[in-house]
């Protein structure tokens, strides 16, 4: 039960082990105890960690926005008979955000400390303060998803096979002729006995098997004669083709979904930007939904036009796509020396370069083409961003001059200025800094608000294209799966080794 002792202990004799709340190693005992009291009646946290919550909000769905900072719990909700990822605020003392675990949820780990998945409304990202807690959280969530998928696939395999045709018609047929014609009446007939059928002796000696052999073969029936009398179609009757139109093949099969090994490059780019995984492409129902969406939008040609239209936005591979991903917020320096920005919202695109001390506002306000020459590979240390983020603000008009002046160092990075440590973080490790953010509470939520809102304004046309529309379709699909699986989960979603407490 919530609020119980931390850790686990075995139950009484003959009873299964009683599950207990799992605390966070970064929180103090009284903070963990307060967190357990917020879980609710008969709710257990199977994994607890200190995180920042990032969301890719629907208007653009291309940029991460920091929403909350607190303790995330993987909750086993016995009254609802389901699992939830819930974020609690220790300062506010309440639930800040939650996402129910549905069957087709894909829990991805672009980095060991930043995990992403598709929520009911948008893409969500968890930035963990401790990688050990992140690893334990990921292992538990993926284990539950795998068990649920295996159980559903097992139910599909247990469906009864299609009924086979009955052999009633054969029972009324004649048995095969005896091997020895004209045999003795007392002789054992070979053919009928081999089939287990009752035999009747023929009393008329004139009727023998030789008479049956001499019968002529039956001639064609009148119906066959009528069919043979029909006029055959010759080549002269076949007209020339008309209305020919070349239609590109999308590579979708109703049974197996999309062929992920032979996908068109433009389709692969579209799916990657929309955050669609290979498991969703090979799922029959999900791939059918994606295929119908592509056909409604104009087929493969429309996808190619959309990709060509967005082609100039991302720069060449060296800058690692800094052009269309500049407003991404940086991450807090980890306890294991990690540095760099958050991964992009669309899964599959290479993560952006580390956070340098270049001028974030010019890179954000200007058009996407200017940032490409920037390498963005310098300044990987977390301390420089908060201190040097202010000076470069005056020179937004001349972004080109900085690159030639000092090579790779002051190059304007394609990263957002909304730095999380701006609220007074210590430059020392991310563990203490993130804990300070949690204890400060709501004040930190306001720091990225104004810059991030302005960052979402520049790319309206690209975000509302096929990529944004497809992401909305997949979000509706996840909500539909969530609602349809709710009844099934309540009916029989108990794991083999996990029983719900009533």
Curated annotation (Swiss-Prot):
For bias type Polar residues, the affected ranges are 201-211
Which PROSITE patterns is this protein grouped with? CRIB (PS50108), WH1 (PS50229), WH2 (PS51082)
* Compositionally biased intervals (Acidic residues): 486-502
Q: What is the effect of changing residue 270 to P?
A: In XLN; a constitutively activating mutation
Q: Where are the GRSGPLPPXP motif repeats?
A: 337-346, 376-385
Reported impact of residue 73 to R: In WAS; severe form
Task: Name its cellular compartments.
Answer: Cytoplasm, Cytoskeleton; Nucleus
Keywords associated with the record? Cytoplasm, Cytoskeleton, Disease variant, Nucleus, Phosphoprotein, Repeat
* GO BP of this protein: actin filament polymerization; actin filament-based movement; actin polymerization or depolymerization; blood coagulation; Cdc42 protein signal transduction; cellular response to type II interferon; defense response; endosomal transport
User: According to its UniProt record, how is this protein modified after translation?
Assistant: Phosphorylated at Tyr-291 by FYN and HCK, inducing WAS effector activity after TCR engagement. Phosphorylation at Tyr-291 enhances WAS activity in promoting actin polymerization and filopodia formation.
Q: Modified residue Phosphoserine is at which positions? A: 221, 483-484
Any domain commentary? The WH1 (Wasp homology 1) domain may bind a Pro-rich ligand. The CRIB (Cdc42/Rac-interactive-binding) region binds to the C-terminal WH2 domain in the autoinhibited state of the protein. Binding of Rho-type GTPases to the CRIB induces a conformation change and leads to activation.
Say what the protein does. Answer: Effector protein for Rho-type GTPases that regulates actin filament reorganization via its interaction with the Arp2/3 complex. Important for efficient actin polymerization. Possible regulator of lymphocyte and platelet function. Mediates actin filament reorganization and the formation of actin pedestals upon infection by pathogenic bacteria. In addition to its role in the cytoplasmic cytoskeleton, also promotes actin polymerization in the nucleus, thereby regulating gene transcription and repair of damaged DNA.
Assembly, in brief, is: Binds the Arp2/3 complex. Interacts with CDC42, RAC, NCK, HCK, FYN, SRC kinase FGR, BTK, ABL1, PSTPIP1, WIP, and to the p85 subunit of PLC-gamma. Interacts (via C-terminus) with ALDOA. Interacts with NCK1 (via SH3 domains). Interacts with FCHSD2. (Microbial infection) Interacts with E.coli effector protein EspF(U).
| Name assigned to this protein | Actin nucleation-promoting factor WAS
